[in-house]
Amino acid sequence: VIHPPRSLTKWQSTSFTYNMTRCGFFDTPAATGTQTITGLGFRPTFAMFFHSMQTTDGAEADACLNQGYAVEIASVITQHARSGRSQEGGIAGSTEYGSGASQTLCIRGNTTTTTLNLEAALTEFNDDGFVLNYTTVPAAATRVFYVAVLIESLGVGIIPSLALPFGVSTPVTGLSFQPQMVMGMHRGSDSCNLGFGTPGSEFSMMSRNRDDVAFGFSPEIWSSTGSVFLSGYGGRDDSVNLTAINADGFSVIKNLITDPRPDFYWLALADTAVSFAAGSFVPPQSGTTTITGLGFQPALLLLIGMQGIGISSAYNNQLGFRNFFGAVDSEGNQWCCGQNATTLASQPRYMSSTSATVRHGQLTNAHTFTFNEDGFDISTVVGAAGTATCAFLAFGARDSSGALPLLGVG
């Protein structure tokens, strides 16, 4: 990580880039209180967190994929967290525990009890990382993955599902900047869902809907190759699209819904010195696939993946990994966190990777990522049957020719 001096100004003739992005992981502490994460080499303004209540690579845990984020805007930290469910018993008649949301936490989750056993809030961004405060910790350590980025302009908010009219483009304004990328997050009946993009280039992931023997099957994944920003939790019966990027916000439209759904949290990003791009790809079964056309060399990829597009069958045709989140950065950090199921009769299980590979499909598929000047290369470490589709959000390194905020590093 290159730390530019404070005196650097954008009129200097030498142009270079420097990374203000990082992904990594940490394990939850044994006791409540503060935990300081260091080693980033810069002061982030935005951090996302993912976990599935377990630590060992490939381990199974009876809890769902959870996610949250924290942002700093005008010295004020705002954070949201969504937790999916844990369950016990067989697929039919499973009991749901702990699903929900928080507007005061960035990390939230539970195992097979009705009591939350992991709660943490981000209390400070500093020159080398961030500080978390735990009010509840699990008996066994949980591995939490994070993505941290310095972004110049950020906006956050909540759109109540019931307040969003059906079929009408609804503006979200008051940001004081024009977003380059918009993200959305909400909780499905099982797990947490994430979407990102710009109008006409939207990508979303969802978990399966709740088990119900009356239906005879479990709708699995709703994802998009470029047309849905946020999809709901009952199969494909709930979706929201971005319809416009405005000078001080964006517009959304609810175009498919059958009954009330969870509110969704949104996050808008813009930066005069950072490039953004979103897209999708199918990881290769063997060899290397090159993705180009981004127009810049990435410094960070945020990945959301699923075993198919719009699949609606018992446990995703039993292909394995139902959905996952992952991240890759230019420091060589690569990780994956998600959930899987092997057969209709099995419980959902969860795993993660902390090695230098992005794993999916019950660890039967593994890939490494390297960045090129116009995109990235995906190389197969382990390939197996079953096609996964990945959507990505790419962040470029900061460009010294753009406007520079105070970095807080010397």
Residue spans for each PLM region:
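Short, intrinsically disordered N-terminal pre-domain segments
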Residues: V1-T17
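Surface-exposed molecular-recognition determinants
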Residues: T14-G410
